[in-house]
Curated annotation (Swiss-Prot):
Cofactor note: Divalent metal cations. Mg(2+) or Mn(2+).
Positions that bind a divalent metal cation 1: A158, E178, E219
Matching InterPro entries: NAD-cap_RNA_hydrolase_NudC, NudC-like_C, NUDIX_hydrolase-like_dom_sf, NUDIX_hydrolase_CS, NUDIX_hydrolase_dom, RNA_Hydrolase_NudC, Znr_NADH_PPase
Cofactor: Mg(2+); Mn(2+); Zn(2+)
Protein name per the record: NAD-capped RNA hydrolase NudC
């Protein structure tokens, strides 16, 4: 599936190594390969955006290696493709040898997978399912500041799905563990791939059922009910968390205005 980059090859370039992304001038490179010293490297086309190919190049650059979070303000599709590239690069880097027999592996030519040349085992990129949920109580929404968000951003609750657990069970468990409350009338909204590091966010809306807020201090700095027209600093547009909050605000406006 991959090939040697030629001088006139062009498009968007996802140059990644160890979950980092090359961002010269803070931007995702776009243009001809020769402009970015990529001629002769191996590249894998991982998608297309606005009629232009999006290429993955597995390479470490000496400068300007950053986080895919830095391009979160891109068009949502291009951001997802950049995230795909970072995840695939890490998958290929970390699966050079078979976990069963220890022999060298090689990439499949027909799908995103690594194949063992000895025992024929097949490996696919790991995807970690997560839940994220907006909880409404009358004219208010539950928002929390996570320990990893020291910039004042408040968002909805989220967490990883555990082995042997349904998405609905994961919502109930995560909400109880992080905030101490129970929810009801759970409704699926949408999903979003989230490359931090390899998550698939499944988004829900729910209604408050019972209980008082008691936060898990290992996860949250605080959690409170916020009236829909008096909200703190929110996640950026384009994130599924922001969509859940905006959808909840729209429901409150329709009912209370």
């Amino acid at each position: 599936m991959d090939r040697i980059i030629e001088k006139l090859d062009h498009g968007w370039w996802v140059v990644s190594h160890e979950q980092k992304l090359w961002l010269p001038k803070g931007e995702l490179p776009y243009g001809e390969a020769a402009n970015f010293d990529l001629v002769g490297q191996r590249a894998l086309q991982i998608g297309e955006w606005q009629g232009e190919p999006v290429w993955l190049v597995q390479q470490q650059r000496r400068h300007d290696m950053g986080s895919v979070r830095q391009v979160i303000d891109l068009d949502v599709v291009l951001f997802q493709l950049a995230g795909r590239g970072v995840q695939l690069a890490e998958f290929y880097r970390s699966h050079k040898y078979c976990g069963y027999c220890g022999h060298e592996m090689y990439p499949s030519k027909t799908e995103w997978a690594m194949l063992c040349s000895h025992c024929r085992e097949r490996y696919y990129p790991q995807i970690a399912p997560c839940i994220i949920v907006a909880i409404r109580r009358d004219d208010s929404i539950l928002l929390a500041q996570h320990t990893r968000h020291r910039n004042g951003v408040h968002t909805v609750l989220a967490g990883f799905v555990e082995v042997g657990e349904t998405l609905e069970q994961a919502v109930a468990r995560e909400v109880m563990e992080e905030s101490g409350i129970k929810v009801k009338n759970l409704r699926y909204v949408t999903s979003q791939p989230w490359p931090f590091p390899q998550s698939l966010m499944t988004a829900f809306m729910a209604e408050y059922d019972s209980g008082d807020i008691v936060i898990d201090p290992k996860e949250l700095l605080e959690a409170n009910w916020y009236r829909y027209d008096d909200l703190p600093l929110l996640p950026p547009p384009g994130t599924v968390a922001r969509r859940l909050i905006e959808d909840t605000v729209a429901m409150c406006r329709a009912e209370y205005e």
